[in-house]
Every structure is written in C-alpha cells, then in structure tokens.
Amino acid sequence: YVKDTANGFMTIADCDAAIGQELNIATGVEHSIGDLANELIAQINPNAKIVCEAERLRPEKSEVNRLLGDSTKLRELTGWAPQYTFEQGLAATIEFLRGNLDQYKVGQYIL
C-alpha cells in the first residue's frame, strides 16, 4: 500500500545505518492477481464475475509468475513494519478513487 511504501522511504531516509544498504519495502505476504481480483470483487461488487478476453491476454512466458518481497533487513535496521493489511490498503484505495473519479478516464480502455 502506498502509505506503507512512503513511510518506508521516510524511515530509510532517517536512518544513517541504511546508507548504502539494499533494502526492500514489502509486506512479506504474497498475493496473486486472482487474490487481488477476488478481493476487489468482494469490496466493490460481490455479484461481479471475472471475464477473460483472449485479445487482452499476455503471451505465455511474458510474465514473472511470482513475486514476494522480504523486508527483514529493513525491519532489523529501523523497526519499520507495514501498518496496513492487503484488504485495508485496497479499501483505502477504493475510497480514494471513488472520491476522485473525475480525475480519471472512467470507461476507456487505453493501451
């Protein structure tokens, strides 16, 4: 979630021991695109169904199948930890977008 990420960057900036270190800002919890889609459906419209359109599918082998970040080193250096769950971050993002729809081209699929 963006607030956790921003807080992580600020925490790193305030930590002299972090200078020159490679650090990950991450939850340490893996979520698939399916998890994301299902949680969005649960929060926005529980009656929605996922429909795949073949022309929008990416070619096989064009994607990384799994990503999982480990922020152990950051936590040990600074005490940083994420403050938002996956579900809380999505809920806050949905609330923000609902309040700012006029800023987006809703209903247009742009590549």
Give a label for each model feature.
Residues 1-111:
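C-terminal substrate-binding subdomain of Rossmann-fold SDR/epimerase-dehydratase oxidoreductases
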